[in-house]
């Protein structure tokens, strides 16, 4: 099984659209979409990873 990851190279973004495509982070928090998740990854200095797609 390949590790699940998301390309966050084009983040952080100053504003995220309100699209609902939830992702579950390694902090067991559900992020609304890739944009909000990637902004959190940047804020965590790369310590936050993707647990899985969908709600936690």
From Swiss-Prot:
One cellular component term (GO) for this entry is:
extracellular region
Annotated ranges, domain Kazal-like: 6-56
What is the scientific name of the source organism? Pipile pipile (Trinidad piping guan)
- Domain remarks in the entry? Avian ovomucoid consists of three homologous, tandem Kazal family inhibitory domains.
Site residues by UniProt (Reactive bond 3): 18-19
The primary site where this protein sits is secreted
Provide the residues annotated with a glycan attachment (glycosylation): 45
GO molecular function terms here?
serine-type endopeptidase inhibitor activity
For this chain, the annotated S-S bridges are: 8-38, 16-35, 24-56
Give the matching SMART domains: KAZAL
Q: Which UniProt keywords apply?
A: Disulfide bond, Glycoprotein, Protease inhibitor, Repeat, Secreted, Serine protease inhibitor
Record's CDD domains? KAZAL_FS (cd00104)
Q: Which Pfam families match?
A: Kazal_1
Q: Which domain of life is it from?
A: Eukaryota
**Which cellular compartments is it found in?**
Secreted
In terms of InterPro entries, this protein maps to: Bifunctional_prot_inhibitor, Kazal_dom, Kazal_dom_sf
Protein name per the record: Ovomucoid
The family database entries (Gene3D superfamilies) matched by this protein are listed as: 3.30.60.30
């Amino acid at each position: 099984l390949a590790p699940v990851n998301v390309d966050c190279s084009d983040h952080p973004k100053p504003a995220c659209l309100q699209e609902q495509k939830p992702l579950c982070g390694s902090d067991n928090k559900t992020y609304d979409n890739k944009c909000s998740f990637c902004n959190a990854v940047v804020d965590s200095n790369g310590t936050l990873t993707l647990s899985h797609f969908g709600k936690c």
